[in-house]
Structure formats: C-alpha cells, structure tokens
C-alpha cells in the first residue's frame, strides 16, 4: 500500500463536491436540565474542521497531493471560516457563494459521548443556471492542470447530472 500512496505524492487533484464545516462543542455533563430530561453540557472547548469534500481535500494534502477544490458555500460567517481554513492550509479553491447557508454539521460532545448533532443546511439544494455554469467553467479551467479528479458527492447539490 505504501507504493500506491507514494505514487500520488505531488499529484494535482481536482476535488468537486459538497464542502461542509464540522463544528464541535466539547464539554462536561454534571446534571440534567430542569426544563427537559436532557443533559446540560458545560462547553469547555469549541473547534472547527473541514468536512465533506473539504475533508477529502485536506486528507489529499496530508498524502502529499496538491488539491484544488471547486464547490459552493454560503455568503456567511461559516463560509468565511472555511475560506480562512483553506487559505491557512494552502488549499487552492474556487468556492462560489450561494443564497443558501454554508452546510454546517455541529456536534455537541459531553463526557466523551456525542449528545446531539445539529445540521444547518437547505434540503435538496438546486443550482440555478448561473451558479451551475460557474461550477462547470471552473471545472473546465482546472481539468488541463490536474492529474486526478475526485468527485465527493454528499447529495447536497453540487454534483448534479450536468456538473
């Protein structure tokens, strides 16, 4: 397997797909809420990681590849956070803003156990023609420059039949 992994080092990889922000709130549970029979998590740490197709790109970077991401994100705080994370890692991208919020998966962990996951996303996001064309144009521009194409489809709208 090391031979296969070494063979992709230095490759330029186009990642097309649904990017997401994974947010974690970690804390301790010492009591049950008086309002409802649910644990109260006293949050001691919060952090974000790249999720979905963005996580694929991060993993490719870790394998020595040069990922290039084409995707959509919201014109919101979480979208800005993701753009900063891509910049900090040096991952090239073309991320087009949509009117929908950035897909965000928020997990609350209490005493090392996941208590709940909150999904911030629009159900069955459909691309308008303009955004679809921007994605297609970005993919067409990138194809001559890359060695590998990865499609990371989570069913959130980027990878439709046209794209």
Spell out what each predicted region is.
Residues 1-30, 45-163:
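Ribokinase/PfkB-type carbohydrate-kinase core domain
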Residues 37, 41-44:
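Divalent-cation-assisted or electrostatically stabilized phosphate/pyrophosphate-binding catalytic cores
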